[in-house]
Amino acid sequence: PLLAIETIEKLTKKIKSVLPLGCKYNADMVTNGYKLTRRVAEKLKDMDIHYIQVTLDGSKQAHDSRRILHNHQPTFEHILDNIRECADILNISIRINVDKTNINEATEIFDWLERYGLKGRVGYYLAPVDDINGVCNNHICMERPQYAKEEIAFIKEGIKRALCTKVLSRAIMVYVEQLA
């Protein structure tokens, strides 16, 4: 959506102009984060878009092999630079897309969060790659029980490193503590 920031601005103004008196507007956005500069983050905040979900496809290696620019340049570190620059302006969560081929590297995100000074500044969580429209190769999609086991291990590692996510519920925290 950030390729069309002017359209977002126009739509936001239009929506706000027709709101009934006393109604407030706010919005969330999902983006790959590549165009999420500080200037863009300030514009989004001014438009009452305060929460941004940035998607990464697993570890740096997995992400950069899947999400490259047309000139074959990697994007992972550029996206983390952008998140670092914007984390004090917007509420940002990183969704880490995982499947059988990259799940074993998922905890590498913790090293990157620490390296980029993002510990405690952003949320993060795993999301399984699902075969919702027949596009995913079924051999790489995880079954729910396998994903659940991997997600619990991921959460436990985050807790161990004191990188508890902003989006962890208290119920999950208690459950994970009981498993430890």
Across the structure, where does each feature detected by a protein language model lie?
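Radical SAM enzyme [4Fe-4S]-AdoMet core and its adjacent flexible, acidic
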Residues: 65-84, 88-179
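Canonical radical SAM enzyme core domain
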Residues: 2-51, 55-62, 69-78, 96-108
